[in-house]
Amino acid sequence: MRAFRALLFVSIVVSASNSASAGNGPKGGPSFMEYEWTEIVATDFSTTERWEPRAGLQAVELHNELFVIAGRTPSPTQDNPFASIIHGDVWVSSDLGETWVELLDDAESAGLWKNRAYFEAVTKGGYIYIIGGQNFTTFIPAPPFVRPSEFFKDVWRSKDGVDWEQMTDDAEWAKLPKKTVPTDPPCGPPVTQGRAGLSAVSFKGKLWVLGGSQGDDLSINAGPDCRQVFNDVWYSRDGSEWHLATDDAPWEARAGGVALVKGGWLYFLGGEKGFTGEDDYFNDVWRTKDGMTWEEVTGPEGAGWSPRPGHKCSVVANHFVCMGGFAALDPFPPNFDTNPSDIWISKDGANWEKVSDSPWNNDPSYSDCIFATPPELPIICDHVRYDFDMLTVSGGKGGMKPSIFTFGGDREIFVPIPGNEFRIENDVWRYSPRE
């Protein structure tokens, strides 16, 4: 989760490129050498029949339908380099992402939840739950071109994506701890006590919330670093009342981690505690059976994949599968770090194998950015995306084998160039065994 860092600045089937031997699949199942990418629908800025290109969205499956919810779209403007369109819409697809129907145009205008991005959506017991997130709001005395974020502490649920019920407007996990590091000038009180970049999952009949952040980072705040990250764990039966499992998990406080369930364990993978240094990103993997007692399954060097936020992981064919993410620690020329172009798998979260260097059929040799002349022309590069969403889906037409679907995402870079706002997606891809 990128926490609104400053923005300075069909169907095609092709086999995924493999840079390492892709481990054998489960007994009787495919190996990842046999997986390929299918573009279900391509990015289209002109369409009105699908959700707009966006990042920080959420996608879930409920009753054999796919739902896409909210998120942010960068908006070109000369006055406000941070301007974004914040969505509160809900879309549904009954044909595995090929066509979409809008169920809700704008939740906030309808008197429901405020439009948001970098929140969590989880399904449990026939409901879609949305939890936390953030928005941009005008806030004085901030400069007129900076709009600090509002962080949300509410929980809503719906059976159909149309009618929503508020479970709480002040979740217990929103109790903000005091900041212990002094700043100059000092940090003022937060606009709200909610959090974004939190991780949520349904596990053992409960909703779980892990970590997250509150407050904008320096690139937005332009003042003291008032952003706080958390390492607490909470659970709830229905999102209305939350109970503390631990206020100090052994993993370092962070936002943008991935929470997954596999083999009776809740796993937590990667994330970030900031965007200014190499040590701000994580590639560790932890697991728990009760939310209180945790064990680290990776060694001192972490997982095989590089530390990153903005990534996504899912479970398919009895493996964790992780891809994407944000890795640009030095986003300016001549160094210009690029995002990781790789796919990694693991059965146990401890031992990882790289099975591809071309997620979404990306050409890894085309990842370095070339600056055009004159400088007002767009740059040429093919950054791998971050802040997309991903889930495992099975069934549908023809009894599809369990497959990974991805939705949208961000490829913006932190250089003031024309067209940067168009480096964002509303495509849908499937990563599945070759038929």
Locate the predicted segments by residue.
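Kelch-like beta-propeller repeat domains
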Residues: 23-435
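Bacterial N-terminal signal peptides that target proteins for export
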Residues: 1-7
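Sec/Tat signal peptide C-region and signal peptidase I cleavage site
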Residues: 18-21
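Bacterial N-terminal signal peptides
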Residues: 7-16
